[in-house]
Amino acid sequence: MPKLKTKSSAAKRFKKTGKGGFKHRCANRAHINTKMTTKRKRHLRGMNQVAKVDTTSLVQQMPYA
């Protein structure tokens, strides 16, 4: 049986956590941020957890994560 390939786009966007979940970067911070308040930019700075519903599809996309 051949090796399973990892989807490189998913590997760049998501990281696995210790308990088996996934985390990702917050959206809406790429450009045109001058109209955003400092508070909004600060809250978008960290990482977010991926919903449990989407975790199964990420496991299939990244079998060795």
Curated annotation (Swiss-Prot):
Q: Name one GO molecular function term.
A: structural constituent of ribosome
Q: Does the keyword Ribosomal protein apply?
A: yes
Q: What cystine linkages occur within this chain?
A: none
Task: Give one GO biological process term.
Answer: translation
Query: Which Gene Ontology cellular-component terms appear in the entry?
Result: cytosolic large ribosomal subunit
User: Keyword annotations for this protein?
Assistant: Ribonucleoprotein, Ribosomal protein
> Source organism's superkingdom?
Bacteria
Query: Which regions form coiled coils?
Result: none
Disordered: region residues: 1-25
One Pfam match, given by its short name, reads Ribosomal_L35p
**PROSITE patterns named in the record:** RIBOSOMAL_L35 (PS00936)
**Classification via PANTHER family:** 54S RIBOSOMAL PROTEIN BL35M, LARGE RIBOSOMAL SUBUNIT PROTEIN BL35M
- What family, per the record? Belongs to the bacterial ribosomal protein bL35 family.
The identity of this protein, by name, is Large ribosomal subunit protein bL35
State which gene encodes it: rpmI
